[in-house]
């Protein structure tokens, strides 16, 4: 594939708002999980909640979109000067030539939960001020971002469970390569809600401790929330126009193995297909990857399947899951971890797997227990969702991409 430029990016999660606080937490191996105190949930588990979401209503002209999920999206869009960079892209290309691709799993379902608590006791009708289309509808986050920037290009919501925030890069790439747009705002946003917490509890997948990916004592996930975005554009025709360390999207792999509604293929066949496709599309070999950001949810079956998918290809490649720090942010996870990959490339370090203290010897992985500075030229980021919806992304720096082109 032709590389795409990540001209700007940002991330907001329980470990920090924006890149600086996120980077500090990753370098210091500092997690943001706390005992669950969300809404009226009575669950013995840990969550990754973003501070300040409920204190910032959505912009007045977008009041119809008012809900926690869109508040979180807005909080993410206003970090790191991201909104200004998008505005500059709109001025350069035109509002009809900038697309929007947002991944989400549950969107603003919390607003529906609250609406049902306010039903008319006589007839059961939902309150008149409940706006399903602008809140709970899975398209809501994409529509909100499109309206936030007054864009007129194509807008899509991607909802493929936990790979949603990664698959947005593939959708944007296809639109750009087809010549339909010149740039895209891609990202993922999912906020906490009772449906998610109790749903994963019913599957017996919630851990009673902060989750411990790839650890011998791992026993389940911790749910988090996040908003992460990137501005994706074509690489300029003149190489001199790029900074030597600019971040590029080099490869994308997607697969759908449909093994089971909530369990991965035990041998990780669909995941491996996505990884191999990403390597092929980037014209790279496994030996070119310097760090793997694992999907790493900390359930026994998920981590084992991902380990088998990586197999001998990456047995000696440093890897870690940042979900021990952020929790599993579901539809936002792929986008959030893409930004982690970009930070690893920009800052030349690999982040530690927070909460993991004793890597499972049964899993073939060179698991990073302490963040360290090292040469990082290309990063593989994995996102594997329920139902076998898999996506792997490869990011690199321009210097490495130039070397790849010369081979």
Task: Identify the meaning behind each predicted range.
Residues 15, 20-102, 108-109, 274-286:
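Conserved active-site "lid/cap" helical segment
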Residues 11, 60-81, 129-137, 155-167, ...:
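Active-site pocket-shaping loop/turn-to-helix segments
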Residues 3-7, 27-38, 42-46, 210-282, ...:
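Condensing-enzyme catalytic core mediating Claisen C-C bond formation in acyl metabolism
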Residues 104-156, 302-313:
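Active-site-proximal gating segment of KS-fold condensing enzymes and close homologs
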Residues 8, 26, 100, 145, ...:
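Conserved small-residue
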Residues 138-142, 146-149, 154-187, 223-243, ...:
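Active-site-proximal alpha-helical scaffold in enzymes
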Residues 43-46, 111, 191-213, 254-273, ...:
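Active-site-adjacent elements of ketosynthase-type condensing enzymes
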